[in-house]
């Protein structure tokens, strides 16, 4: 069964010579694991769309235990995040929190929007990282129902 959805790549793990396993936060499926075959090859159509912190349009096929990425189209890449170590560390921390909270589909949309807004703020350096960290933690825990 094929599913078309948007999503943010939270985590990527290299598997084999040219494959990656991605953890993707989607608004309608929640947090999913997907295998992107050949995505590490420079000439692959999946190369740029499956990068870390890439917001993309995915076409996924469901497998037994996880999904497979059939196609992906980049919607937004947060290039400014990698400009500083502090920004990269904060973005990784936020992605880890989002993956651990594993929101169900109704709440996943709000978590995704919050994370995308925070990644944009880190990328454009609108606020100090310490302030963004506090804002994200408070809002993410509130959306998850802990506060």
What spans do the regions from the language model cover?
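Non-catalytic alpha-helical scaffolds and adjoining flexible linkers that form interface surfaces
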Residues: 1-147
């Amino acid at each position: 069964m094929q599913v078309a959805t948007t999503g943010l790549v939270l985590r990527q793990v290299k598997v084999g010579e040219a494959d990656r396993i991605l953890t993707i936060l989607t608004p309608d499926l929640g947090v999913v694991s997907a295998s992107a075959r050949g995505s590490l090859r420079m000439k692959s159509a999946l190369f740029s769309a499956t990068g870390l912190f890439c917001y993309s349009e995915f076409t996924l096929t469901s497998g037994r235990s996880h999904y497979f990425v059939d196609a992906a189209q980049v919607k937004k890449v947060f290039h400014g995040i990698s400009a500083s170590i502090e920004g990269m560390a904060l973005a990784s921390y936020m992605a880890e929190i989002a993956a651990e909270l594993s929101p169900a589909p109704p709440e996943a949309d709000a978590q995704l929007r919050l994370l995308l807004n925070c990644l944009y703020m880190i990328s454009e350096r609108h606020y100090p990282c310490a302030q963004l960290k506090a804002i994200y933690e408070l809002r993410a825990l509130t959306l998850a129902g802990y506060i």
